[in-house]
Amino acid sequence: MTCSQPNLRVTIIAADGLYKRDVFRFPDPFAVATVGGEQTHTTSVIKKTLNPYWNEMFDLRVNEDSILAIQIFDQKKFKKKDQGFLGVINVRIGDVIDLQMGGDEMLTRDLKKSNDNLVVHGKLIINLSTNLSTPNTNQANGLHRSHMQPSTSSGLVPQVSASTPQPSPGPSQADPTASNPSLHPQRVPSTTRPSSTIVPANGPPAPPNGQQGSRTNLSSFEDSQGRLPAGWERREDNLGRTYYVDHNTRTTTWTRPSNNYNEQTSRTQREASMQLERRAHQSRMLPEDRTGASSPNLQENQQQAQTPPAGGSASAVSMMATGATTAGTGELPPGWEQRTTPEGRPYFVDHNTRTTTWVDPRRQQYIRMYGQNANGTNTTIQQQPVSQLGPLPSGWEMRLTNTARVYFVDHNTKTTTWDDPRLPSSLDQGVPQYKRDFRRKLIYFRSQPALRIMSGQCHVKVRRNNIFEDSYAEIMRQSASDLKKRLMIKFDGEDGLDYGGLSREFFFLLSHEMFNPFYCLFEYSAHDNYTLQINPHSGVNPEHLNYFKFIGRVVGLAIFHRRFLDSFFIGAFYKMMLRKKVSLQDMEGVDEDLHRNLTWTLDNDIEGIIELTFAVDDEKFGERRTIDLKPGGRDIPVTNENKGEYVELVTEWKIVKRVEEQFNAFMSGFNELIPADLVNVFDERELELLIGGIADIDVDDWKKHTDYRGYQESDEVIQNFWKIVRTWDAEQKSRLLQFTTGTSRIPVNGFKDLQGSDGPRRFTIEKSGDPGALPKSHTCFNRLDLPPYKTNDVLEHKLSIAVEETLGFGQE
């Protein structure tokens, strides 16, 4: 029997991912709640959105057999035949809440079709509560997080938590049982749709066998193959890619867990995968590291001064003293002084530049650089007196081997090299320009005083199972100057001295954790499922700017101490770090659909076809705003004459302006360790290699998982292509990978797991183009358009030019 007084409070919180029936406009949705056809309540209308947020409450009279129906309509079409129907849910009250016992339940339901069978899409989140004593205006703010059902939406849960901002504890104060975990980085829910970030469960992981979730939303915990293992949830990102969330371990995967899933087996598999990634990460190097030798325990004695740098034979260039000198007689140049070490070895002080050297400035020593000419024979490339090169950079010293060969010691980093850091390039003319530039830039970059390790030690102690929080506390409490001291990493409960191995492990583990989309600070790009971009809605965590500053410090710290991070970003992110202007091409990795639409707009006549203004709609935590791209933009129509400006402004807003606050916080931390004027010597592709290193690429695996269009694997062009790739060194291969796929990163399981913008996408070589043209790349599809070149030499020449001269991450 129905109660005479209201006994249930229904809160219609939000809908997510509604179906868009019009190409160029969004609906104006509102919801209608009815019980038994007698009680009807209507929410307000939310303008222009697919993700409306109402958070409106209604008190109803119900019994356990009552059916609560909530329909969503588009107000703009409400007077039409279909009333702008967008979906409906029907809930039997007795199935979800015990009216006698009382309770509070959060429901997330898939929207269903009506009898008209119109296409619908999305979910609806509501709250049912028997507690009517609290004021309606505060009801939604008091929702019990422990009953909140994880949503496929990445834009709904934050709207609830954001309404009650509370101070977020620092990472070092993490508590798994915190009453408001959604504000902690390890519990932050993802915040935007569209987004491929992970939406963690608010509160405890899902109970075994779906005891709680099974009543409210079975579809998230099962698929066509049956029910998922306990604690697992199936979701889709905005690109329609299915991924799985393991709430037991707070991890995500693109692979469905098997029905005979075992947590221990899964943990073992994750450890094996992590070990593969660790080995790949630790094998990454840079060109300077490959040709010079590291000597961590360099001794300042004369005997070692006669020891040549190990690995010098790897260099393509030999630098030797000619033996031609002038007599070291007469007075020293003005400002110079001769001194003697305690061992009796003379050295010279230049008070003009405040530097010291073993070389007598009165002696005119010549440096001769050797390389190979086109015939493969050695020839002199350059010969010039040392005195004309100026002083060595701070912390550098020139020495001679016992065979009179010159080498250089960098006391800042305790490394040695055959290459004179003052020379523009010590590589032979046959080496590609980009490689000469990159190595030259590295030598210059690392020789600067701002990159010199300061005296003392910087101790960082962390727990492996709490590395994000501990690292935040340790790194943010220290000054930038302290972080420039020798880095000493200590893992709690483990004995060991850090001679490089521990710090490499530290950056490997930390980069896996802090860039995890689970925390909502970063999200996967539209290009694939392993490159990252800033989450524009990271503000669900009120402390997010502090975390971005921390992450900036970590990236700077890794570069400063010559360590690599196991994370890779979209090309536009590296451009932004270099303060370069982004282009429409960069949009491809951020929003492929928008990139395609903007490209169509540029290439076609839009007069009378589409109506656009210099404004965009943006949704943040349920609030939809119109943003002018230029003053008064919402009143300025887009025409064929100004559409180029429109595309440029939309691109800048989508890539830069939406995350400007987060990015500035990131750069403030980064520039505390790496000055902006120094990092700007690199281009965006070089910066990716500087941060992530250069991997050893398995050409056999690459070739094995390659498809061909218009070619056969046995064709001469294809045979020559792979022959050329095999002869290239690791850096050239990484450059080719950047050119064709947009990133130098290789999936953990090799090229078989290569991803494109629309899911798994194998590397493809297509027969396309005139033999006189350069190869082209399509990074969204991992495709190389390779013309049918007649000879191996022409192929190598054209391919090298395409790879080294391309400014962006691919030409199309």
UniProtKB/Swiss-Prot annotation:
One of its GO terms (biological process) is regulation of rRNA processing. Residues 148-165, 174-199, 214-223, 250-267, 292-306 have a biased composition (Polar residues). Residues 226-259, 330-363, 390-423 form the WW domain. Residues 479-812 form the HECT domain. The keyword Repeat applies. Residues 307-330 have a biased composition (Low complexity). Residues 131-235, 250-350 are annotated as: Disordered. It catalyses: S-ubiquitinyl-[E2 ubiquitin-conjugating enzyme]-L-cysteine + [acceptor protein]-L-lysine = [E2 ubiquitin-conjugating enzyme]-L-cysteine + N(6)-ubiquitinyl-[acceptor protein]-L-lysine. The active site is at 780 (glycyl thioester intermediate). E3 ubiquitin-protein ligase which accepts ubiquitin from an E2 ubiquitin-conjugating enzyme in the form of a thioester and then directly transfers the ubiquitin to targeted substrates. Probably involved in the regulatory network controlling carbon source utilization. This is Probable E3 ubiquitin-protein ligase hulA. It comes from Aspergillus flavus (strain ATCC 200026 / FGSC A1120 / IAM 13836 / NRRL 3357 / JCM 12722 / SRRC 167). The gene is hulA.
